[in-house]
A protein has these predicted regions:
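Conserved PLP-binding active-site segment in aminotransferase class I/II-type PLP enzymes
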Residues: 1-17, 27-30
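Conserved N-terminal alpha-helix of the aminotransferase class I/II PLP-enzyme fold
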Residues: 54, 61-94
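Short acidic, glycine/Ser/Thr-rich loop/turn "cap" segments at secondary-structure junctions
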Residues: 56-59, 103
C-alpha cells in the first residue's frame, strides 16, 4: 500500500504546540517549526479507522486495556526486538516524562544524585531539578563527529557522587546514537556493581537507520532486567503524543510496586480511552505504514546530508544512527548563541531547538526534526541557506 507522506497538512489552528504557540514562546507567528518531536504526518489509516469507531460509539467512560491490549504491545516488542515480556510487568502512564519523574521520586530522596549524559533530552534535567535531586553529568565525548560514552568518567561520577539512579536515553536524543551491545552491557555492569537503578527511555526505539539495531536494555541479561525500568510509548512511532499513553515495563516486582505507589500518589488512575484504542490498533496493524514511513525518513535524511554537503558545508551533520531528529553543528559559523538565534529565527524564519537547552556540550548545535514532507524540509533548508549567505562567514580554511 502506498502512503502519501508528501501530503502537506495544515496544522495551524489545531491546538498543536508545534505550530500554534510560536508567539507565546517568543517566536514570530510566521516561523517554520521543526523543533518539537512530533511528525507532520497523519497517523496510520488503520489507527484513524479504530478511533473513528470509538468516536462513533459516543460513550467515553472510564476505560482500561484488556488482554488484547497487552498482546498487541508485547507481540510488537517480541517481533521487532526479540524481547519477551510478561503482562504483570506493564504499568501504563500518560507519558514517559511522567514515568521518569515518578521513578525519580520512588527510588531517590531529595538531595540524592541522579546521573545523565548531556547533551540529552532536556526534560531529564528538569525532572531531576524539579524534584530537588542533584544532577550529575557524564558528558558524552564528541570525536570526529561521533559521540561516545566516557566509561571511566561514568563510573567515577557514580562513586564520587553516590549516584542512586541513571537516566539512559536509548536511542539517544538528540545526538542520534543507537547504543551497541557492548556499550549497554558496560552500563549495566557498572550500575549493578554500584547499586544504581537504570531508567531506560526507549521511546525512539522503532526509528533506527540501516546498519543499526536497537537493543532493549532489559533483554540483554536477566540481572539487568531486575535492575531497570523500560519506558516505551507509541507516541513517536505513530505520532500519537496528544493521546498520552506510555507503556512502562518493570520486571522486578519490588521495583514495580514502589513505582506504582509513586504513580498513585500523583492521583493518576487510568489512561484515556482514545489512547488505549490508538495504541492497540497501531501495534496490531501499523507495521506496513511504519516500514514505508522509515523509508521516507531515510530519504529526508539523505536530502539533508546532500544539501548541507553541497550548499552549506559549514554546517555539519552529526550522522544519526536512529531517531528522526538531526543534530547539526553550527560552530563553524562563529556565532554566539544570541547571534545564531537571530540568524535562525529572524532571518531564516525557522524554529529549531537550540542545542544549549540539552545541557553541557550542546552549545553551538541545533536539533532539527525531519519528520515532515520533503517540500517542508526543502523550504526550511532553502531559508537557512539564504540567511547564511546574507552574512559574512567565519570559516576556518
Amino acid at each position: 500500500m502506498g502512503y502519501d507522506f508528501d501530503r502537506v497538512i495544515e496544522r495551524r489552528g489545531s491546538l498543536c504546540i508545534k505550530y500554534d504557540f510560536a508567539k507565546e514562546r517568543g517566536r514570530a507567528e510566521d516561523v517554520l517549526p521543526l523543533w518539537v518531536a512530533d511528525m507532520d504526518f497523519q497517523t496510520a489509516p488503520e489507527v484513524l479507522e479504530r478511533l473513528h469507531g470509538v468516536v462513533s460509539h459516543g460513550i467515553f467512560g472510564y476505560s482500561e486495556g484488556k488482554d488484547a491490549y497487552f498482546k498487541a504491545v508485547s507481540t510488537w516488542y517480541q517481533k521487532h526486538f526479540g524481547w519477551e515480556t510478561e503482562r504483570n510487568w506493564l504499568v501504563k502512564t500518560p507519558g514517559v516524562v511522567f514515568a521518569i519523574a515518578a521513578a525519580i521520586r520512588a527510588f531517590t530522596k531529595e538531595g540524592e544524585a541522579v546521573l545523565l549524559q548531556q547533551p540529552v533530552y532536556y526534560p531529564f534535567a528538569e525532572a531531576i531539578r524539579d524534584n530537588r535531586r542533584r544532577l550529575v553529568n557524564n558528558p558524552l565525548k564528541l570525536t570526529d563527529g561521533h559521540y561516545e560514552i566516557d566509561f571511566e568518567d561514568f563510573e567515577e561520577k557514580i562513586i564520587v557522587n553516590e549516584v542512586k539512579l541513571f537516566l539512559l536515553c536509548s536511542p539517544h536524543n538528540p545526538v542520534g546514537r543507537v547504543w551497541k551491545k557492548w556499550e549497554l552491557e558496560r552500563i549495566g555492569e557498572i550500575c549493578l556493581k554500584h547499586g544504581v537503578l537504570v531508567i531506560s527511555d526507549e521511546i525512539h526505539s522503532d526509528f533506527t537507520y540501516p546498519g543499526h539495531t536497537h537493543l532493549v536494555f532489559a533483554s540483554l541479561r536477566k540481572e539487568f532486567a531486575e535492575n531497570c525500568i523500560i519506558c516505551t510509548a507509541p507516541s513517536k512511532t505513530f505520532n500519537l503524543a496528544g493521546l498520552q499513553v506510555s507503556n512502562i515495563f518493570i520486571p522486578n516486582k519490588e521495583l514495580r510496586q514502589r513505582f506504582r505507589k509513586a504513580v498513585a500518589q500523583t492521583g493518576y488512575s487510568q489512561v484515556n480511552l482514545m489512547g488505549l484504542a490508538a495504541t492497540q490498533a497501531a501495534y496490531e496493524t501499523g507495521e506496513e505504514w511504519l516500514a514505508e514511513l522509515k523509508g521516507y525518513l531515510g530519504g529526508n535524511l539523505e536530502f539533508v546530508r546532500t544539501f548541507l554537503g553541497e550548499r552549506l558545508p559549514e554546517i555539519k551533520l552529526t550522522e544519526p544512527e536512529g531517531t528522526y531528529l538531526l543534530w547539526l553543528d553550527f560552530r563553524q559559523l562563529g556565532l554566539t548563541e544570541e547571534e545564531r538565534e537571530e540568524l535562525l529565527v529572524k532571518k531564516a524564519k525557522l524554529w529549531l531547538d537550540s542545542g544549549a537547552i540539552f545541557g553541557a556540550g550542546g552549545e553551538g548545535f541545533e536539533r532539527i526534526n525531519i519528520a515532515c514532507p520533503k517540500s517542508t524540509l526543502r523550504q526550511a533548508l532553502g531559508q537557512l541557506e539564504a540567511a547564511v549567505r546574507e552574512r559574512p562567514l567565519a570559516i576556518d580554511n
